[in-house]
Amino acid sequence: MYKRQVHYKFALQNKGLGNSVIKGVTEVINRYGKAIVLEDDLILAPNFLFFMNQGLDKYKEETSVFSICGYSNKVKVPKDYSYDTYFCTRSSSWGWATWADRWNSVDWELENFDKYHILKKEFNRWGGSDCWKMLNDWKCGRNKSWAIRFCFAQFLQKKVSLFPVTSKVQNDGFDGKGTNCKRWSRFHCIFDNSAKKEFTYPENVSIHPSLFRSAIGYHSIIKRIFSRIMYFVYRF
């Protein structure tokens, strides 16, 4: 049995989503050198911690890997693809992990924001058609997202994230009550209920073109329009 300690820390006032995550993760990650971060509306696979910790150990010194993600879209896996994992550009904030050096490389303020406008199209090709809008909305005060700033740092540094082929996380927040989640979602996944504890990884840290298209396709304009229509259908 592992010995565990639970530490609680309460804020005297609501700091907001972005500030709370940034300050909380910074405190933990600077103490332990790495962190696994969860939200309270996530359902975890039985092997979630095995997957996350193995990824953290395996890619600790591989700085081209920016994060380990527990959630995965329902990707179309090629028949000749034999690994349990794949690399993709855009990180996921639904059950994820990273290391202190990568976390502390993020520019959270982006004070010289105007110089990044020329990267709008490239950023969207890299991570999906909604990337620049979310980043610009944050800058304009229309959202408090820390995650899009994390993704932008990853984009600027040309780094990747590790994902499971079968998701180790399921988001249970699509009841319309969550801050950023609606009742219907295109992100329902194939959830791993297996007892598998050892995972296989690609030999090289590189993007598989087919898996990339399948994963990033969830953020395409067509998918987003369809999702918006379905959201309105499910409202009534």
Specify the residue positions occupied by each region the protein language model found.
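An acidic/histidine-cluster motif and surrounding catalytic segment
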Residues: 3-37, 42-236
